[in-house]
Amino acid sequence: MAKVEQVLSLEPQHELKFRGPFTDVVTTNLKLGNPTDRNVCFKVKTTAPRRYCVRPNSGIIDAGASINVSVMLQPFDYDPNEKSKHKFMVQSMFAPADTSDMEAAWKEAKPEDLMDSKLRCVFELPAENDKPHDVEINKIISTTASKTETPVVSKALSSALDDTEVKKVMEECKRLQSEVQRLREENKQLKEEDGLRMRKPVLSNSPAPAPATPGKEEGLSTRLLALVVLFFIVGVIIGKIAL
């Protein structure tokens, strides 16, 4: 007896294509349409039930309606040299009057009432040009971030360590500048006093005015020289820190 032709329409009709990589679950959809004026029962079977999850794997499609079936391939180690021998079969029959117990209805169905369509599984790896660049982009960003972040952190740490020393040196410089300014004013005042003494009329009965105390002037000169040397040392320290 001739086999009854499948009344359901299948999209795709002959192949279920699964596109890798296969390190995660890969899902493809199978659309079942019922162009008839009667409700149709269906079930989806596979030769490798442990490798696939099918949702829904059975049901009833109303007249003129359609349903999408998700076929999920579980992760596995893909071998391009190994051809897939997995197959799916969509089996169908017109729904009986009583659909309360579909398991019994399938068991009681006559072979001539059953219709089926077979599809083979095809595994595909994405082409080089079609591969997503997210992984590469993330890798580049990560590498760039690592390269730029390390010097910044090191520089910040170095700056934090140097800031204390620089601050101390700057405070010392300010103190020395104030001291130099004070000495300059004191030296200027002494010179003015010395000039005033020189301009005063010399009285015959009065002893000649004594010039500015040499010891004091020598002390000022010595202190100025010491400050100059100290400034030089501070400059060298700042130069080393800056480097």
From Swiss-Prot:
Marked site positions, Involved in binding the phosphorylated serine of the phospho-FFAT motif: K43
Top-level lineage group: Eukaryota
Main location: endoplasmic reticulum
InterPro entries: Ig-like_fold, MSP_dom, PapD-like_sf, VAP
Chain coiled-coil ranges: 161-196
Gene Ontology CC annotations of this record: endoplasmic reticulum; endoplasmic reticulum membrane; Golgi apparatus; plasma membrane
GO MF terms, alphabetically ordered: beta-tubulin binding; enzyme binding; protein heterodimerization activity; protein homodimerization activity; protein-membrane adaptor activity
Annotated ranges, domain MSP: 7-124
Cross-link (Glycyl lysine isopeptide (Lys-Gly) (interchain with G-Cter in SUMO1)): K147
Comment text on domains: The MSP domain binds the FFAT motif of many proteins.
UniProt subunit comment: Homodimer, and heterodimer with VAPA. Interacts with VAMP1 and VAMP2. Interacts (via MSP domain) with ZFYVE27. Interacts with RMDN3. Interacts with KIF5A in a ZFYVE27-dependent manner. Interacts (via MSP domain) with STARD3 (via phospho-FFAT motif). Interacts with STARD3NL (via FFAT motif). Interacts with CERT1. Interacts with PLEKHA3 and SACM1L to form a ternary complex. Interacts with VPS13A (via FFAT motif).
Family to which this protein belongs: Belongs to the VAMP-associated protein (VAP) (TC 9.B.17) family.
Entry function: Endoplasmic reticulum (ER)-anchored protein that mediates the formation of contact sites between the ER and endosomes via interaction with FFAT motif-containing proteins such as STARD3 or WDR44. Interacts with STARD3 in a FFAT motif phosphorylation dependent manner. Via interaction with WDR44 participates in neosynthesized protein export. Participates in the endoplasmic reticulum unfolded protein response (UPR) by inducing ERN1/IRE1 activity. Involved in cellular calcium homeostasis regulation.
Name assigned to this protein: Vesicle-associated membrane protein-associated protein B
Originating organism: Sus scrofa
Taxonomy of the source species: Eukaryota, Metazoa, Chordata, Craniata, Vertebrata
This protein's encoding gene: VAPB
